[in-house]
Amino acid sequence: MIDRGWAIVATDYPGMGTAGRYPYLIGVGEGQATLDGLRALCQVDDAHASNRVMLWGHSQGGHATLWAAQIAADYAPDLDVVGVAALSSATDPLAVSKLIIEGPASALVNAVTSYVVVPYADEYPDLTLIGLTHPAGSVFADAAASRCATDPGTLVSLLVTLGLGGRDHLYDLDLDAGPVHDRLAQNIATAIVPAPLFLGQGVDDEVVSIDIQRTTDARVCAAGRPVETHEYPGRDHLGVIAQGSPLIDDLFV
């Protein structure tokens, strides 16, 4: 990409080794962090970066990308968003949470659930770290809040150390009604963005259901917005962006 004349910036979210709350699947926080990074890049003289930007991201990054595009006109009117690409995007945090939490219990499921519960409890006053079903649950929640959410192995090890091996769900969350449901729904990305949209996902995605992308595509088409949607049979959540994936050529053609 650099050889083709692109300048690249990767999002540095608040709370990831710096002060602030980590906005995991919290749309406005993710979107603002993404746009802040682009604005900073435009101020680096040696980068020779213009204000014409392409937004793209995978998984949580796809969610952040869509929210960045949605709020760009108001939050960063100095940026000219010319294209948006969301890959295997966690566009609907409520649907993603249901897929993960309503499945069989495991240490990894409990760890991943904490990635959502802890930031949401930090962000929203109507949510607290309640509903923990194990006496050591509060200890785990406190420890999880101080660890990098991109390191599931660390959190799984912590669960095992605490004797929370995953035979039971650590959290008791009502995803059909109430404040947890409402806050997750509040952070669904509409994907109605002011630039051409590219959606791409593996059909065999085990983390984000392909149905989420299909629903997003239908919503964007109904709104009359330009969208190019690709599905990749035989590709899972990470495989769709692996070296040799046909998505790469489709994205940069």
Regions of interest found by a model, annotated:
Residues 24-46:
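Alpha/beta-hydrolase active-site loop
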